[in-house]
Amino acid sequence: MKFLAVLLAAGMLAFLGAVICIIASVPLAASPARALPGGTDNASAASAAGGSGPQRSLSALHSAGGSAGPSVLPGEPAASVFPPPPVPLLSRFLCTPLAAACPSGAEQGDAAGERAELLLLQSTAEQLRQTALQQEARIRADRDTIRELTGKLGRCESGLPRGLQDAGPRRDTMADGAWDSPALLLELEDAVRALRDRIERIEQELPARGNLSSAPAPAMPTALHSKMDELECQLLAKVLALEKERAALSHGSHQQRQEVEKELNALQGRVAELEHGSSAYSPPDAFKVSIPIRNNYMYARVRKALPELYAFTACMCVRSRSGGSGQGTPFSYSVPGQANEIVLLEAGLEPMELLINDKVAQLPLSLKDSNWHHICISWTTRDGLWSAYQDGELRGSGENLAAWHPIKPHGILILGQEQDTLGGRFDATQAFVGDIAQFNLWDHALTPAQVLGMANCTGPLMGNVLPWEDKLVEAFGGAKKAAFDVCKGRAKA
């Protein structure tokens, strides 16, 4: 509404300026009538007998008017006759047009006067324009003043007791006036003046009200603001304390959960030892897991949970019995929210692939000859570097495989099946058929010499994250565990 009032006021000022300019231009249009010399009389208007047509008609009119006076008789001298009294002529009040091609000194003087008058009018119009701009700036300033005073009035009234606040609508404000009124500037000034008076009255009443009360004056705006600031600081401190407490509880619960999981793993190992007494195999890693046919229910599960890994090396001995139809999935590791956290898979006629967080790298490995092979896969999160070894030889390497993605902890490691969900939903077409032994997992990348020593049985190593032990591997669905010495078995092959 204030913006509309400013627009209307500006339009009214422009309209008044246009009217003043029109009024001021009227003397300029009437100036040719004043071009005639002020001292001219009837004699100069009718002096020449051989003038133009309009002048002849005026002379005739003059002669007709003069015939009413006394005439001079013939034969009498002209000097003896008194001149007749002057008779007012109608031509004195007629607008006699002058010829267009009649140069005279009076016209040149009048042209100079007209130019001066035109310059005067132009300066007057410029002054009116400047006045309009000043009035518009004043309207803007008054609008800002009204906004500031209204805010100050609200703050002051908020500090008054409820009995001092006006219950009804306030008068002498901009809401009572018509925004399209010609007296908009006066209304603005009145509104500003009324707001000033009201603020002064309220500021005077607040100390008086505080002095009349025996208790401390909490109605002062400064006291209210300070109280609100104090409460806000207390609330903020409480919120920060609660946030710290929640963070501490979350951290403590995470540590507690890890400790509980460690204890559970230890208890599971203890229970397995108690159930089986000592290991059925000597040494404990001298066994294999056999999956005789392709299906979706035979598999082996590792009981130990994995920690978060930023690098790993997984090594195993495998013998595929699937022929040339694809080797399936020797192992898969899934976590909550990601079924393909780590997968070693060969599906159909495709080459063997390593999947990490659903990112794929093709490995130049071949296991289709139904013989025992030692394979190792190493990977690091830095730049996603990976390497693939078969029988102690480096077959391929690459980078940008799930770079900077750490392997998530607390997942499920399955031998022989590919997981579509956490710990289940196996697909028979992706199942492994054959034997698996010596599956070990490290939390770092092994050197080529270490890989070669394990492959030729000259430097056997056990995984520091997951060793191949009888008590940590459990067979399900018809998969069988049997005693097996990998070095002797490979020598026989």
Curated annotation (Swiss-Prot):
Residues 24-493 are extracellular. Binds 2 calcium ions per subunit. Its cofactor is Ca(2+). Ca(2+) 2 binds at residues 418, 420, 430. Keywords: Calcium, Disulfide bond, Glycoprotein, Membrane, Metal-binding, Receptor, Signal-anchor, Transmembrane, Transmembrane helix, Ubl conjugation. Disulfide bonds join 315-376. Heteropentamer with NPTX1 and/or NPTX2. Also binds taipoxin-associated calcium-binding protein 49 (TCBP49/RCN2). Interacts with KLHL2. The keyword Ligase does not apply. May be involved in mediating uptake of synaptic material during synapse remodeling or in mediating the synaptic clustering of AMPA glutamate receptors at a subset of excitatory synapses. Residues 285-487 form the Pentraxin (PTX) domain. It comes from the Eukaryota. This is Neuronal pentraxin receptor. GO terms for cellular component: glutamatergic synapse; plasma membrane. Residues 1-2 are cytoplasmic. It comes from Mus musculus (Mouse). Ca(2+) 1 binds at residues 340, 418-420. It holds the Pfam family Pentaxin. SUPFAM superfamilies: Concanavalin A-like lectins/glucanases (SSF49899). InterPro entries: ConA-like_dom_sf, Neuronal_Pentraxin_Related, Pentaxin_CS, Pentraxin-related. Residues 57-72 have a biased composition (Low complexity). It is a single-pass type II membrane protein. GO terms for biological process: neuron projection development; neurotransmitter receptor localization to postsynaptic specialization membrane; regulation of postsynaptic specialization assembly. Residues 37-72 are annotated as: Disordered. It is found in: Membrane. Signal peptide: none annotated. The chain crosses the membrane at residues 3-23.
